């Protein structure tokens, strides 16, 4: 009976975390460049039950009765990096990455991060920045140096070679970083990542006046969320039944005494 209690409790903890992941996905359905997370679960190590009470010719005969699992546990949360659809904004400071890779952005402390969200703006100093205030990094085509993209009061135009020309100013190429293994990326915020050992992206094109939408499967997430709630409630009922039975047993033992 207690094993059933442990199994239901572990399942509820797992379901609670799954619901948290699903809720966060749904909350970011309109977040540009957001990538859907999925909770991966696995079973606890199975225990083998055996019986030593079976005797043959007076000698104990060890007999395996089968396996026993104590439920599931959280293994990892993985991110689906499938590309989202493109949304036309007709805003010249919006950019969408078509293909693999991430815009390289830098915070005020000089730390590099990576994002698929190209909804940029020009700050009071004239630099192209993210909505979070991170500098958008590019390669200056005149000096070949990596630096924050400076726009000033000029107009931006992106050509077919992904080169960003600033009216009356410099030309840049966005620093597009990619990774050999996306599993090493960590979400800093919902659509910004940190990662080690980036490589130069070369399998992409950029669309000006567009944004990449979230890749969350809305219908699938709602369906899974409803199923998770049902499973959670079913485990609650199991625990309530076990609790009621244990109380009854304790009461009967007390009355015998």
Q: Which residue stretches match the model-derived regions?
A:
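Amphipathic alpha-helical polymerization modules
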Residues: 1-257
